[in-house]
């Protein structure tokens, strides 16, 4: 199935300041994550015809063009069935249909629907995050689950670290030929990228736990120990990330965390 990527300039914390939108299929097509309207995307949407609009998640840097393209194409607008209010708030639109893990979105006429996109549950970066498998054994549109260079923000309270790491392992097990991310270039060695992201998270988690074991209690104290780099400009993101790691460690019984102070778990 044909997949076309559009890098759209938007206000985003992601490196490069762009979000990837995707058109999947040809006449008709599925539009994924229209972050904003652009002339180039307008032209191809008009040429191909869009039958469905789907979001990997409803963060602001992924939804800016939803209202315009929904009105322009009369496409079916899909929302995660567990997060309908969040969808309405983010897009200003009512969904036409609801999706959930395992849903299949078919493309084409009723008499010839041979192309399908399968929805995967992929929470962590966001609670409503899904990934999309393009045809059987095809690439996966992974949104903000993965990025080729750097790391993905998983910050509490919106992000959930335990879920995110499970999502990375799920994608690793699927082993798609490519990952099509929400930001940056296509990931053509998915398992290598997913292993790198998992190792990054496990390394940060070790440093958070070591900080707590060494006596750091508050977020600020743990932050200073868990990060070696200069946090100028990204301190709030780092703080949210540390909180997400602490919540994961607390659920697993490896630290005590009450939302304000941390302490080592009892042996």
Residue spans for each PLM region:
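Conserved beta-strand hairpin/beta-sheet module of binuclear metal-dependent hydrolase folds
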Residues: 1-46, 131-148
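Active-site HxH/HxHxD metal-binding segment of metal-dependent hydrolases
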Residues: 10-17, 34-115
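Residue-level signal for the nucleotide or nucleotide-sugar donor/cofactor binding architecture
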Residues: 19, 64, 159, 237
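Histidine-centered divalent metal-coordination motifs
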Residues: 56-62, 125, 183, 245
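Metallo-beta-lactamase
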Residues: 111-123, 127-205
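Hydrophobic residues on short alpha-helical segments
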Residues: 194, 198, 202-213, 243-247
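C-terminal regulatory/interaction regions
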Residues: 211-267
């Amino acid at each position: 199935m044909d997949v076309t990527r559009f890098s759209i300039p938007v206000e985003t914390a992601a490196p490069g300041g762009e979000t990837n939108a995707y058109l999947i299929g040809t006449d008709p097509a599925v539009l994924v994550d229209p972050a904003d309207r652009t002339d180039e995307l307008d032209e191809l949407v008009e040429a191909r015809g869009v039958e469905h609009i789907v979001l990997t998640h409803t963060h602001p840097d992924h939804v800016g063009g939803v209202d315009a393209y929904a009105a322009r194409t009369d496409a079916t607008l899909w929302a995660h069935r567990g997060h309908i209010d969040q969808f309405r708030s983010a897009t200003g639109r009512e969904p036409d249909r609801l999706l959930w893990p395992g849903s299949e979105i078919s493309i084409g006429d009723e008499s010839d629907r041979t192309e399908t996109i399968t929805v995967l549950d992929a929470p962590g970066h966001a609670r409503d995050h899904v990934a999309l498998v393009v045809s059987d054994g095809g690439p996966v549109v992974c949104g903000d689950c993965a990025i080729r260079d750097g790391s993905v923000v998983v910050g509490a309270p919106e992000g959930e670290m335990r879920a995110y790491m499970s999502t990375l392992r799920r994608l690793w097990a699927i082993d798609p030929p490519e990952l099509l991310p929400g930001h940056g270039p296509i990931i053509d060695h998915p398992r290598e990228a997913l292993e790198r992201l998992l190792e990054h998270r496990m390394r940060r988690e070790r440093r958070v736990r070591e900080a707590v074991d060494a006596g750091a209690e508050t977020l600020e104290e743990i932050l200073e120990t868990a990060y070696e780099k200069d946090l100028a400009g990204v301190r709030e993101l780092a703080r949210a990330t540390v909180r997400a790691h602490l919540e994961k460690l607390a659920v697993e019984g490896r630290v005590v965390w009450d939302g304000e102070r941390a302490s080592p778990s009892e042996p």
